[in-house]
Amino acid sequence: MAKIDLTEYLEKLKEPEDRETVANREYQQQLFLEYVVRGDNFPEQRATLLRDYHAGKELTGPKGLRRRLGAFDLEYFGRAYLAHYFVRRSPAFHGELDRIWREGVLKGKNPDTDAKEISRADGCRRAIEAPRGHAKSTTFTFKDDLHAALYAYKHYIIILSDSSEQAEGFLADIKTELEENAALREDFGELEGRVWKSSVILLANGGKIEA
């Protein structure tokens, strides 16, 4: 029986993970460079972020460029943190949904710096009608609720649906991301709070999401 070089074997085991790590880092870099110059809102902040990138500032982490750009660019937030849901550029309809959230909920402000002001602003009532399969719930109930909870500009989020089971299903998806999403955990830290149930969760940053 041929002998196995244990060191070589262990190195081979590491290779796929290393390749995946490198590929993810390259993806995040390319995505950032694409989106930081693509949007038309917050031009001064975008220019600052681009300068910071070329100056060698960290892309990821609690003070990273990814988190800072994701605060006011909702499409980038989806593709940077939830790439398994948002796999390509958003169509025009999704851009319209993002615009509704930016203007109606965020009030045109940057939640990374103005979270308290956003949270104290008047609410927004909008009715959105579109055929099934147009990702309305994925965009609003999933992505945007996560965005509001992570950047802490909404402290009590209620998920309403046709049934409690369906609402809890959306909350379960959000919980999964908070528990297992490496990018979210790297930039926003451990967010699991003292209540973590199928119908309600409390986040470590003080936020609450209830189905």
Task: Describe each model-derived feature in a short phrase.
Residues R120-D145:
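Walker A/P-loop
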Residues G123-P131, A152-D162:
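Short acidic, glycine/Ser/Thr-rich loop/turn "cap" segments at secondary-structure junctions
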Residues H147-Y156, E179-A182:
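Post-Walker A helix-loop "phosphate-sensing" segment adjacent to the P-loop in P-loop NTPases
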Residues L160-E210:
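Conserved nucleotide-state-sensing and coupling region of NTP-binding domains
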Residues P16, T138-T139, L171:
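C-terminal PAP-associated
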Residues G95-R102, T138-L150:
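Contiguous, well-ordered alpha-helical segments that form the cores/surfaces of helical PPI scaffolds
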Residues M1-G123:
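N-terminal accessory segments
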Residues S119-A121, L150, R194:
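Generic structural signal for beta-strand residues in well-ordered domains
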